[in-house]
């Protein structure tokens, strides 16, 4: 039965239809931009009102739905099929939503091609609870800095912190920035000069040395703008892409082809799967171009996070916006150096890099000359 009865005559289809109605009504009432806040308890109250149930009845109904979904998954597993159940997925989502209705979450409705309801946790220490219950833990990464912020985020008690210099030769990595461009919204969209200079920098830097290069954008929208304007065709190289929503298998195919193509170019997003999860040893990646600072796009979610961090830590913008951007940039730059023999250059196309602690970038009057000098070209 593809539409099993789960509680008091209600079927799965009834619950799905209910959720569609609630989502549609939430969009009509609260949505004014890409995503917007809905009141805490909104979803639970709507379910109670529309179904005529108490909170206990809602929970019992969802537990019954969960059991029905588990039965579907178990049957598929028995038949050696992928144990996937959309019934189970929906039940898990609704149960998780009900259980997290509290002070450290905000609740959002989103529109667009993929409308959704989202419960977003503002406090990282909630997810770190298993660590906090241990006698002691060790957290180690090249991108944890600033350590005092990491300690605050996770709510660690009486920590011992230590920061060590990189064991790799410092002369193997050069990081620089330019002063005449920025991806700040009013500059990027206030006229064509800044955008055209960004394009020219990317074209000139890719063309100045025949090295495998990654161009990291602060957003998919800016990357798509470069693509739509024909920049890949101006580079004279094979160009590969990390695109929004790309299946993992397709992304891995792109990465294999990129790594096998000497001097190829990769378009990716700072903070995406490539910049934070893949290694490029040896000559697989030698030049990284960071087009701007990956500050989070203004949104209801981001506003809520800034407000929460300001109230809890007294530094809302730094904690919610600046530090995450720096970590993303450090991750992207870190793709260049994975061993003591790797060498690489990172060029940040944004004057604001000068003010970012933890990036340690030097001013490049002419980044093309700096890159060519680093690799010994004349």
Protein language model regions, located:
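Conserved coupling segment at the C-terminus of the helicase ATP-binding
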Residues: 1-213, 218-233
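Short, well-ordered alpha-helix to beta-strand connector turns
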Residues: 134-135, 236-237, 285
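Short acidic, glycine/serine/threonine-rich loops at helix termini
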Residues: 149-152, 189, 227-229, 278-280, ...
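Short, solvent-exposed amphipathic alpha-helical segments in soluble enzyme
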Residues: 152-156, 230-232, 281-285, 305-306, ...
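Conserved RecA-like helicase motor-core motifs
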Residues: 158-163, 231-253
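Conserved RecA-like P-loop NTPase helicase motor core
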Residues: 179-193, 242-352
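Long, largely alpha-helical accessory region at the distal end of helicase-like NTP-driven motors
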Residues: 214, 221-223, 338-378
